[in-house]
Amino acid sequence: MTVKLTIDCMGGDHGPSVTVPAAVKFVRAHPDAHLMLVGIESAIRAQLKKLKALDDPALTIVPATEVVAMDDPVEVALRKKKDSSMRVALNHVKEGAAQACISAGNTGALMAVSRYVLKTLPGIERPAIAFALPNPTGYTMMLDLGANVDCEPQHLLQFAEMGHALVAALEGKERPTIGLLNIGEEVIKGNETIKRAGELLRASTLNFRGNVEGNDIYKGTVDVIVCDGFVGNVALKTSEGLAQMLSDIIREEFGRSLMSKLMALLALPVLMRFKKRVDHRQYNGAALLGLKSLVIKSHGSADAYAFEWAIKRGYDAVKNGVLERLARAMADNSVSLGDGEHDAGGAGQASPAAGHHAEPSAAQSSKA
């Protein structure tokens, strides 16, 4: 099966100088992939010429005359720029010409245009950005990571339902554990939105284990962590900054003297493994969950290496049938939520997440 993806080549901080090289490298490594490069034709052609890929049959240029800037208001992207690379890329997915869209564009604009063009699954009011964060035994699903800055309690419940469905579909778990990100485990902690969301989660049939704190994110305390997009995005980017700082400190300390440089040579295999594990670029590419089609959001500041990972998320999601499995799990879960008995879930308790051993698929991964 040929996997057909649209690439919003003009999105992100760097546009075609990042997206096109990433696309070229990806198709050279994945012969069953066909990428539609959407954007300003002359800009895309210039990059393809540099890479000697103008005649690559796995790459098709799809012209678009407008660009959604990173600081464009949502209404501009939605109502005025109807021939933007973002809109055209999403239209191709809607029309069935492609199976997923990958964009590093403006998060708010991407969510709004995606909702308008592709529509949401039944019972979902707002899509959410879901990302698989590594933990000692695998990955913890976390959402929302930037699509919704302000959320109502029922939105957080819907995010939990989507996270439950995704983990159930991908990991085969009947009852994934759910945690609500808060400033403390106690039910009295948090603002009114969080308290009400906790009540809704405890009244649902989801396997809700109560509140979790920021230090639980990388422990694997629960399978799914739910939060609003403001909190999630800050937590994610704080993690990225910390990982970068640790790498810089280690590099600086090993470079201080001749002796430390010799020690670095001896420790090189360990250092390389450490660098690979904390390199956030390999986790780039987060699914916009809740839509009727696949959309992968790349970090806006991604370089070519990171954007190639975002393409891989979309490719893997299509290959693994993630959208179909998620839709089935959501439908099954809606039945259980309607017919099931009350399950308070034990607020404030935690149990280890288990079974996360595979590399995160496209629907599981990163950045807003």
From Swiss-Prot:
Annotated protein name in UniProt: Phosphate acyltransferase
One annotated GO molecular function: phosphate:acyl-[acyl carrier protein] acyltransferase activity
Subunit structure: Homodimer. Probably interacts with PlsY.
Chain segments carrying region Disordered: 337-368
InterPro entries: FA_synthesis, Phospholipid_synth_PlsX-like
Reactions accelerated catalytically: a fatty acyl-[ACP] + phosphate = an acyl phosphate + holo-[ACP]
Alphabetic keyword roster: Cytoplasm, Lipid biosynthesis, Lipid metabolism, Phospholipid biosynthesis, Phospholipid metabolism, Transferase
Lineage, highest ranks first: Bacteria, Pseudomonadati, Pseudomonadota, Betaproteobacteria, Burkholderiales
Gene Ontology cellular component list: cytoplasm
EC number: 2.3.1.274
Function: Catalyzes the reversible formation of acyl-phosphate (acyl-PO(4)) from acyl-[acyl-carrier-protein] (acyl-ACP). This enzyme utilizes acyl-ACP as fatty acyl donor, but not acyl-CoA.
Main location: cytoplasm
